[in-house]
Amino acid sequence: MQNNEQTEYKTVRGLTRGLMLLNMLNKLDGGASVGLLAELSGLHRTTVRRLLETLQEEGYVRRSPSDDSFRLTIKVRQLSEGFRDEQWISALAAPLLGDLLREVVWPTDVSTLDVDAMVVRETTHRFSRLSFHRAMVGRRLPLLKTASGLTWLAFCPEQDRKELIEMLASRPGDDYQLAREPLKLEAILARARKEGYGQNYRGWDQEEKIASIAVPLRSEQRVIGCLNLVYMASAMTIEQAAEKHLPALQRVAKQIEEGVESQAILVAGRRSGMHLR
């Protein structure tokens, strides 16, 4: 699984340079002159000025009338405000799942809650030689039938869990029957919390040949997603899968959590103390 895919078109040099200047201005408290930016970037002063004037015209930088330096404007915050948790998770998880695939061989998915189901945001199914599905991104995984769904229910806040179960229980059909059996469901969720992972062994009607284990992804003491490992049920039991692969899943989950936390701190820092003058 590669971090950077080959593209059909050449890199737009002007865009690359403009982004480089934005990054430099963010690191230089109090702004920077054309000369300093030219020195740091290695670009000609005329090129730097032209790029800055373009960014100024678009509203991302402004020129200080007092010392002729350039500084970021508040508009740059808009570049990250539309980036939701699931997008951070997907971006951070992709390279980590690639490394995980080489270790566990079986495919893994990162999913997040979408109303009444878990939605796959990132996956290694298309890269795993043991995968039985190639197109998984965007697929909805039922909460009561999959390891990821049960993991979410097990580790989410109690009030959230109660509301989700009530919603599922109100729906007709066998897919939601478990929500109408509170003692049975709570035993399943309690076991997941005790063992640190959720499980599914041939429990999903649409995928009767598969089994899976999943661990929660947390940020600021809340569940933001789940990381699962999917395999052919005939290959091993849940206990064997956990013994063999749970440590790797937990390690990668922690790495994803640390990445999300770092991004959250970075975004918060930019919002509260970004070098906007």
Swiss-Prot record:
One Pfam family named in its UniProt record: HTH_IclR
One MF term in the entry's GO annotations: DNA binding
Transmembrane annotation, as ranges: none
Keyword Transcription regulation part of the UniProt annotation: yes
DNA-binding region per UniProt: 34-53
Record GO biological process: catabolic process; negative regulation of DNA-templated transcription
InterPro entries per the UniProt record, alphabetical: GAF-like_dom_sf, HTH_MetabolicPath_Reg, Tscrpt_reg_IclR_C, Tscrpt_reg_IclR_N, WH-like_DNA-bd_sf, WH_DNA-bd_sf
Keywords assigned: Activator, Aromatic hydrocarbons catabolism, DNA-binding, Transcription, Transcription regulation
Domain HTH iclR-type: 12-74
Domain IclR-ED: 89-262
Function: Activator of the mhpABCDFE operon coding for components of the 3-hydroxyphenylpropionate degradation pathway.
Protein's name in the database: DNA-binding transcriptional activator MhpR
Gene: mhpR
